[in-house]
Amino acid sequence: MEKKMFNSLMKIHQKYQDLKQLLETDQILNDQKQYLQIAKEIASISEIIEVFQKFLDDQKVLEDAKTILIQEDDPELIQLAKVEIATMSKNIEEYEKKLLILMLPKDKNDEKDVIVEIRGAAGGDEANIFVGDLFKMYHKWADSQKAKVKVLSSSLALAGGFSQIIFQISGQKIYSKLKFESGVHRVQRVPATETMGRIHTSTATVTVMPKIDEKIEIEINPSDLKIDTYRSSGAGGQSVNTTDSAVRITHIPTGIVVTSQDERSQIGNKEIAMGILKSKIYNLELQKQQQKQSDFRKLAGSGARSEKIRTYNYPQDRLTDHRINFSTSLKPIIQGSLNPIIEALLAQEKTELILQNYANK
């Protein structure tokens, strides 16, 4: 192991010990907020400590075996030492690989919940139906992760699905798992209204944004906002409310427009719209920072229309993610079994981070 990495691990090891001791003090035990904060910090480095401790233990066994090999004359002891050296060397190599991945820079947003926006793009009615299919897919995946889904804003489409839907998913490390879902999703299938059996191609754009919590301050000048109220509407623009409870907020400097009409009160819709706006402004800044990263990692959070990231081919029961040349059966994915593709995307992210780390040395 490189000295620099070993020293970093020793510092983390010491920090872990200090935090464990601090957690047992009366001051922290009597302060629930601080207790939870420190417990969370301990949990965030516990896996590194567990692997590093195994590394240290096996390193000691290895050194002892090497000493026996040098000092002992007994053939049986020498043979046992050789076996020990081979075993420990293999273990240590595996621990080093694990630690290399565990020590990679963490995305500060990985722990956050997400706000997902899906819009119908090319394809008219079929694109809107596809938006509905994607929403169901993410909802089923969230259910499988014991995560909560809350619709923040939606516009029903006459033929089915949505022209646009914005929803929040809350759970454990949701952003880390869904951040690479952003981009253009393309569907190829025979629409229910197609009498000639021809395959149509439609698209929907997905944008995954980290939900902004109270700790992050997003400064928005009230004079930069244009706020309009109107009556909420259903599919086809039909009014479903007799009061102006729906809210549209335009952030003039960025041109971002957000709407909310699903809450019954204007106050509730304004609160939701402001939450979406803050996440969009934060995500905009995040994309600027990510331009400095690798081509693959900068895709996180971007819903640019030019980025056709994935194709859902119904006739061939095939899903293809074009960024990593990953193909699998479509049916389980559209039913919410997203983990295989999420894991493949995260593996690609780790590979690029490792390569980037080596390039910077």
Curated annotation (Swiss-Prot):
Keywords: Cytoplasm, Methylation, Protein biosynthesis. Methylated by PrmC. Methylation increases the termination efficiency of RF1. GO terms for molecular function: translation release factor activity, codon specific. It comes from the Bacteria. InterPro entries: PCRF, Pep_chain_release_fac_I, Pep_chain_release_fac_I_sf, Prokaryotic/Mito_RF, RF-1. GO terms for cellular component: cytoplasm. The modification N5-methylglutamine is found at residue 238. Gene3D superfamilies: 3.30.160.20, 3.30.70.1660, 6.10.140.1950. It is found in: Cytoplasm. Peptide chain release factor 1 directs the termination of translation in response to the peptide chain termination codons UAG and UAA. HAMAP family: Rel_fac_1. Belongs to the prokaryotic/mitochondrial release factor family. This is Peptide chain release factor 1. It comes from Mesomycoplasma hyopneumoniae (strain J / ATCC 25934 / NCTC 10110).
